[in-house]
Amino acid sequence: MTEMLKGIAASDGVAVAKAYLLVQPDLSFETVTVEDTSAEEARLDAALKASQDELSIIREKAVETLGEEAAAVFDAHLMVLADPEMISQIKETIRAKQTNAEAGLKEVTDMFITIFEGMEDNPYMQERAADIRDVAKRVLAHLLGAKLPNPATIDEESIVIAHDLTPSDTAQLNKQFVKAFVTNIGGRTSHSAIMARTLEIAAVLGTNDITSRVKDGDIVAVNGITGEVIINPTDEQVAEFKAAGEAYAKQKAEWALLKDAKTVTADGKHFELAANIGTPKDVEGVNANGAEAVGLYRTEFLYMDSQDFPTEDEQYEAYKAVLEGMNGKPVVVRTMDIGGDKELPYLDLPKEMNPFLGFRALRISISETGNAMFRTQIRALLRASVHGQLRIMFPMVALLKEFRAAKAIFDEEKANLKAEGVAVSDDIQVGIMIEIPAAAMLADQFAKEVDFFSIGTNDLIQYTMAADRMNEQVSYLYQPYNPSILRLINNVIKAAHAEGKWVGMCGEMAGDQKAVPLLVEMGLDEFSMSATSILRTRSLMKKLDTAKMQEYANRALTECSTMEEVLELSKEYVNVD
């Protein structure tokens, strides 16, 4: 019987194929009293080691297929597996209660999950609960000899159907065979949606109950552009979806012709389309998609992929590779954004209730704790500056004195290198990320001292709306089109331009096709996004008449009071599916 469902359009693409149900194994077990608790501890150690090995392999594969940023979620999982406090408590429970490893694991991890989930005002801790749940499931499967579903074994064209896809599930999808996936839960900002867009696999999430409606082998039609899903479609519906898929493929081929074109609107205004990267390996994809710059190089992955602080020479080689790979095009490097969800095993930071609002990013860099590490990074960047057009920006800036402290270190190390006879470029722009509302509101003052702004919308929206975008309970508050967010962005752009400074954006909003027309009219100079979004965005911009968009932007900023009103207004001015 044919059924139609509507979900959240999370990743563009159209596909028709057989359903592949990703079924979770039965992980039930009996609690058993044991005499030899040391044997149970040994079983636990073996399961932990097997899980670590497994996740390390999955992470390596994710780096190759998805890039460092998407793969970073596995670092949190690996940290849970190596958490001495949790492991110690599990073993203590096994000994004290003379129970089997399965029961000890479940009792302790359930306790941690309950504690963290109870912190409703702390999204960071709730994310840690999800990490512990995923890791505990993997360790328990090894203890029971059960096999977790492995999407990497799919060897025919399929559409994956699941309640949810964990990051490790998504990282193992082979795009040669997996043409789309559909889940019961999730949204556009979930890890699986972000990974799907990187892989260029169609995805529809949040259908509520597709797993109860589909059987293995059913034909499923998925439109990741509209959010439509049809189970066992008619021949006519299959033909319609295939035609839509062919039209989308044709559209992508047309976009590819724009690889070497400048990004110019219909009335002749030029904007810079840049790409976000995490490692030098990403530069190949940046050039393949016709980026005019690197708008965000996340340097923290240099630290997260290392067992110790990366040396000045190691960093220099990485920065040099990116600058040379971009052949003179601008490269905006963000200094280390450590802290929050990015911890380093070799950097001892204090435990915090909410690390996202705590000791992180530039706050570490200009402190006594991070000063030497920061100076090493600045020296490496300065040495690499002669190999291309380097721009440096500092993350998580709230106060002018923070920028001044960081800029003073930059100036000191530049003078030191010159005194040592090391060649350094004298044309390095230094700017800041605008991701804290305090900096956005004081943009006119910052603009007098910085060379540029880059708006980090992911965090700016979260901090303005006090809502974690990865927390489904409050994800409705993550509203890029909320008039308060639009006014903040407009304020930043106008303040920068008043001082003759340029403004970029490196959050997901920069590649959002419905946001681009608004941002163009506000005067955003640089749009930095995932490399795979560049050609589509360039195609959209070529059709825009900025004069026509002016009324749209003015009305959105002055007349609208809700996100829904802005989205409804957009239908009058721009046609974006």
From Swiss-Prot:
Phosphoenolpyruvate binds at R298, R334, N458, D459, R469. PROSITE patterns: PEP_ENZYMES_2, PEP_ENZYMES_PHOS_SITE. It is found in: Cytoplasm. Signal peptide: none annotated. Its main location: cytoplasm. SUPFAM superfamilies: Enzyme I of the PEP:sugar phosphotransferase system HPr-binding (sub)domain (SSF47831), Phosphoenolpyruvate/pyruvate domain (SSF51621), Phosphohistidine domain (SSF52009). Transmembrane segments: none annotated. It comes from the Bacteria. Keywords: Cytoplasm, Kinase, Magnesium, Metal-binding, Phosphotransferase system, Sugar transport, Transferase, Transport. GO terms for cellular component: cytoplasm. The keyword Zinc does not apply. Its cofactor is Mg(2+). It holds the Pfam family PEP-utilizers. General (non sugar-specific) component of the phosphoenolpyruvate-dependent sugar phosphotransferase system (sugar PTS). This major carbohydrate active-transport system catalyzes the phosphorylation of incoming sugar substrates concomitantly with their translocation across the cell membrane. Enzyme I transfers the phosphoryl group from phosphoenolpyruvate (PEP) to the phosphoryl carrier protein (HPr). The N-terminal domain contains the HPr binding site, the central domain the pyrophosphate/phosphate carrier histidine, and the C-terminal domain the pyruvate binding site. Homodimer. This is Phosphoenolpyruvate-protein phosphotransferase. It comes from Streptococcus equinus (Streptococcus bovis).
